[in-house]
Amino acid sequence: MVQRLDSFYQEQSIPQLIKEFHYKNKHQVPKLDKIVINRGLGDASQNAKVLESCSKEQSIITRQQGVVTRSKKAIASFKLREKMPVGLVVTLRGDKMYAFLDRLINLALPRIRDFQGVSRKSFDGRGNYSLGLEEQLMFPEIDYDKIDQIRGMDVSIVTTAKTDKEAMALFKTFGMPFKN
């Protein structure tokens, strides 16, 4: 099933970006490569229920099962042993990636209190964008009564853009709300 944002990209974003940046053909136009959603769960090493509930929440939000990240070495001051669970990662590609970005831009971000837009400074210099979300409640799929604790997540959007200017133009065509 073709996602709404994917068809919008094909029909409107590509011609607009070709006109703006004077690309020779449509294969030079930057596109989304993947979206990586990461959640660090510090207390998951002591409590298995935390890992289970966060995994369930993340799979509801992303509609894809996450991979548990484990510690690489033991750190006594954090009460952490080697290979203990410390987080969850989901990598979205294809239709699920476009569906998640569409829900993030049009449903989740507008639900944030006092939201004025996402930062323009979160580009990495190579056309990729990262943002941190402070709570999972901004997604309409998450029920307030069923969460045990408010936890955030990091969202990294990887594009094929060579510069931040190209990536920002791509995100603006998708309707990403940037601060002035």
Curated annotation (Swiss-Prot):
A GO MF term: structural constituent of ribosome
InterPro entries reported for this sequence: Ribosomal_uL5, Ribosomal_uL5_bac-type, Ribosomal_uL5_C, Ribosomal_uL5_dom_sf, Ribosomal_uL5_N
Alphabetical keyword list: Chloroplast, Plastid, Ribonucleoprotein, Ribosomal protein, RNA-binding, rRNA-binding
Tagged with keyword Chloroplast: yes
Highest taxon, organism lineage: Eukaryota
Intracellular or extracellular location(s): Plastid, Chloroplast
Biological process annotations from GO: translation
One GO CC term on file: ribonucleoprotein complex
Pfam family, one: Ribosomal_L5
Principal cellular location given in the protein's record: plastid
Assembly description: Part of the 50S ribosomal subunit; contacts the 5S rRNA.
Family according to the record: Belongs to the universal ribosomal protein uL5 family.
PANTHER family associated with the record: 60S RIBOSOMAL PROTEIN L11-RELATED
Role of this protein: Binds 5S rRNA, forms part of the central protuberance of the 50S subunit.
Protein name per Swiss-Prot or TrEMBL: Large ribosomal subunit protein uL5c
Source taxonomy: Eukaryota, Viridiplantae, Chlorophyta, core chlorophytes, Trebouxiophyceae
